[in-house]
């Protein structure tokens, strides 16, 4: 006999997704479906677990982020009469929030951050949209909407570019990230007097940021003398220290790794790579499946050259191609690229990514708000079989199946 029931998942008290589970019982066996996170669907695939380096990257990020004295999560109450500056933890903030938050913390203001993306924020973002965009931009709208009445000011910069290893590179963000402040301001009808919205050229370093912030800060928030200069430079150093901590840990991981064993290297844009809702907890699933997977931030990709791509002006695109070159050069490294539907730059970049890898297979996971964990796990399982066959073939064992060396395209 088959018994069936439905109930709301309560496995994680901190999860607000309210997933409606479908539970089937076949005698002594039980099968559970319907969860957004894949907690139940992945169980039959699990092997000897590996370290979750996505979680480790998040811990390092949080450690550096919350070293400021006045940086609050949303549930914390403001502790003084100082103005509260809201920073939405989406898009560029998934990498640069340390810099953003510490500027205002160093000035003595309180900084309120949004919590990790959940279904409530996704719903708020979708409701606020006035045009079709990629999923990360929709989520950004949700974070801003969630924060709107919980801070005195909202910090919504227009980040134009990022630091580049070579001064000739332009390193620009995609237009959606550059203009995210304009999009959300129009969609939510935000009052100008509540916004701090400087144009920030991160490629130019902290000196330029001081000038831009001085122009953008409301008069009542502008510090006297060189206070802003000191605050920005200290915040910049904190951001750079975070990068160095990742590189140091990455070197340690690679030194301990057996070079004859496969290593999956996961590339992508920080705002989907390090948001558990956008990546569907990819790091956790890979670790539970026994797959050693390293996100790109642990790699010293800056040392790679892009002389064969002289006109690559996307900053994050250049980073992804540098990571691809490292994957191509190391025999037992395998590439996983995480992207989104409706991502204009990635629609071009994926071809260059495959070109750089040449003979190596890669897994491209293309996600949006409609993606489900079960489909992603199927793609991962298929790609894992390809990797195993290639490893067997490379080290002399007869593979179960001769794997075609082609790009595994996620549907």
Predicted regions and their residues:
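An N-terminal assembly and electron-transfer interface module characteristic of large anaerobic redox
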Residues: 1-411
């Amino acid at each position: 006999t088959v018994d069936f029931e439905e109930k709301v998942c309560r496995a994680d008290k901190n999860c607000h997704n309210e997933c409606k589970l479908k539970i089937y019982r076949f005698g002594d066996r039980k099968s559970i479906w319907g969860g957004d996170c894949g907690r139940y669907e992945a169980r039959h695939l699990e092997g000897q677990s590996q370290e979750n380096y996505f979680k480790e990257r998040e811990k390092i990020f949080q450690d550096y982020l919350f070293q400021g004295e006045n940086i609050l999560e949303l549930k914390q109450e403001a502790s003084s009469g100082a103005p509260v500056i809201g920073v939405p933890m989406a898009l560029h903030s998934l990498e640069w929030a340390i810099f953003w938050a510490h500027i205002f913390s160093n000035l003595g203001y309180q900084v309120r951050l949004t919590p990790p993306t959940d279904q409530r924020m996704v719903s708020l973002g979708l409701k606020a949209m006035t045009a079709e965009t990629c999923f990360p931009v929709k989520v950004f709208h949700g974070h801003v909407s969630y924060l709107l009445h919980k801070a005195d000011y909202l910090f919504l910069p227009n980040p134009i570019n990022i630091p580049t290893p070579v001064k000739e590179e332009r390193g620009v963000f995609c237009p959606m990230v550059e203009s995210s402040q304009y999009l959300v301001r129009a969609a939510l009808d935000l009052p100008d007097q509540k916004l701090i919205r400087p144009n920030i050229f991160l490629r130019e370093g902290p000196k330029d940021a001081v000038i831009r912030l001085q122009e953008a800060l409301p008069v009542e928030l502008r510090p006297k003398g060189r206070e802003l200069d000191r605050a920005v430079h200290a915040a910049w150093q904190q951001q750079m220290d975070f990068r160095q901590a990742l590189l140091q840990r990455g070197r340690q991981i690679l030194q301990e790794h057996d070079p004859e064993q496969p290593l999956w290297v996961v590339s992508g844009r920080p705002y989907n790579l390090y948001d558990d809702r956008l990546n569907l907890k990819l790091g956790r699933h890979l670790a539970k499946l026994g797959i050693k997977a390293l996100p790109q931030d642990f790699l010293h990709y800056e040392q790679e050259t892009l002389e064969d791509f002289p006109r690559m002006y996307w900053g994050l695109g250049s980073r992804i191609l540098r990571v691809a070159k490292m994957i191509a050069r190391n025999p037992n490294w395998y590439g996983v690229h995480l992207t989104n539907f409706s991502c204009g730059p990635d629609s071009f970049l994926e071809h260059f990514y495959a070109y750089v890898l040449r003979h190596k297979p890669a897994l491209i996971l293309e996600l949006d708000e409609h993606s489900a964990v079960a489909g992603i796990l199927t793609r991962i399982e298929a790609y894992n079989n390809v990797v195993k066959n290639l490893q067997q073939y490379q080290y002399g064992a007869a593979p179960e199946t001769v794997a075609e060396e082609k790009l595994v395209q996620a549907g």
